[in-house]
């Protein structure tokens, strides 16, 4: 079926976490959705599972593309152009913003204005997303995590021994690591 042979209710640009979630929710409501992605689907091969190949070796990062930092200096973007977008390199971590993240924030460069919505208004949508993505966790492990109306549906995965060692060292130094 050609794209122009059909009427779409919505066109979503980008098949990463946000775009794919939006397309999924709209299609569940019976809407015709066209999802446009600049990258292709990653072939199912071992080098597309390895974080080293995907992130450190920049296998799917844009070649020859530079973005500009606040000082105007160019830097290579840490992004992936593929179906799924940066979910290919994000480590499957889905954190909620903190309550204070929604407030006005003074920075060296100026003031970042407050969001037009609050954490409390976003909380039901966090619940929906966490349920849809089957997020694992336990409230209270991260001492900075905001309040939640429901506990995680899925318990956290056990911490791997090497990460437990790192966690212990960081805690001895007064840090608050969590997994």
What are these regions (language model features)?
Residues 106-179:
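Conserved redox-cofactor binding core of oxidoreductases
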Residues 2-120, 124-127:
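N-terminal glycine-rich phosphate/pyrophosphate-binding loop and immediately adjacent elements
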């Amino acid at each position: 079926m050609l794209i122009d042979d059909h009427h779409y209710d919505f066109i979503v640009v980008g098949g990463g976490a946000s775009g794919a979630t939006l397309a999924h929710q709209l299609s569940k409501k019976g809407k015709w959705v066209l999802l446009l992605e600049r990258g292709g689907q990653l072939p199912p091969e071992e080098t597309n599972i390895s974080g080293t190949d995907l992130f450190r070796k920049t296998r799917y990062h844009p070649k020859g593309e530079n973005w500009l930092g606040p000082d105007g200096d160019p830097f290579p973007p840490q992004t992936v152009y593929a179906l799924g977008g940066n979910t290919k390199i994000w480590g499957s971590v889905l954190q909620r913003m903190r309550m204070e993240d929604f407030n006005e924030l003074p920075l060296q460069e100026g003031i970042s204005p407050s969001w037009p919505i609050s954490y409390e208004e976003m909380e039901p949508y966090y619940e929906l997303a966490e349920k849809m993505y089957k997020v694992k966790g336990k409230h209270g492990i991260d001492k900075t995590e905001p309040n939640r109306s429901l506990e995680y549906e899925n318990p956290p995965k056990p911490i791997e021994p090497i990460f437990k060692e790192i966690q212990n060292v960081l805690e001895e130094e007064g840090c608050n690591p969590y997994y």
